[in-house]
Every structure is written in structure tokens, then in C-alpha cells.
Curated annotation (Swiss-Prot):
Lineage: Bacteria, Pseudomonadati, Campylobacterota, Epsilonproteobacteria, Campylobacterales
Residues passing through the membrane, by range: none
Name of the featured protein: Small ribosomal subunit protein bS18
Entries under Pfam families matching the protein: Ribosomal_S18
A GO BP annotation: translation
SUPFAM superfamilies: Ribosomal protein S18
InterPro entries named in the record: Ribosomal_bS18, Ribosomal_bS18_sf
Gene that produces this protein: rpsR
Gene3D superfamilies: Ribosomal protein S18
Keyword Ribosomal protein: yes
Keyword field: Ribonucleoprotein, Ribosomal protein, RNA-binding, rRNA-binding
């Protein structure tokens, strides 16, 4: 019988840092919730609590609307680091 993998417990980094508000202009903080193709990563992968996940989603959508974060990334750009310019 195969052994079960032991995973480390995921924690919400925003709760631990006692963040009250997530600003859409802070792209350095928002990039941790984005995949390499700038898609919003789900809670089960990031470990973010429901309250902060909703705040992150709203902030990312606002940043996209103001053109601080792109909506999509070309395949060619994924080979390079898309977060290099942030």
C-alpha cells in the first residue's frame, strides 16, 4: 500500500500579517495570487481565507481595469518571467 503524503498546513499570509485592506495599486502583493499567465489562483492553492480571497479578487480586477496588471499574457511572454516588470 502506498504511503500517504504529508502536506504542510496552508495558512493565510494576510491574516498572519493582520492586513486590513488590500490595495489594487500594490502589484507586488497581488502577484502572489496570480498564476504565471495572470489568472487568479484559487483559495485551495494559495491558502488564503475566504475574506481575504474576496478582497484580493476585487483588487486584481480593479488593477486590471486600470491597466496595472494585464488580462492575458501571450505564450511567448510566459517563457520569460511575466512578473519582471512589476
Amino acid at each position: 500500500m502506498a504511503e500517504k503524503r504529508k502536506y504542510s498546513r496552508k495558512y493565510c499570509k494576510y491574516t498572519e500579517a493582520k492586513v486590513e485592506f488590500i490595495d489594487y495599486k500594490d502589484t507586488a502583493m497581488l502577484k502572489h495570487a496570480l498564476s504565471e499567465r495572470f489568472k487568479i489562483m484559487p483559495r485551495r492553492l494559495t491558502g488564503t481565507s475566504k475574506k481575504y480571497q474576496e478582497m484580493v479578487e476585487v483588487a486584481i480586477k480593479r488593477a486590471r481595469h486600470v491597466a496595472l496588471i494585464p488580462y492575458i499574457v501571450d505564450r511567448k511572454e510566459v517563457i520569460n518571467n511575466p512578473f519582471e516588470g512589476l
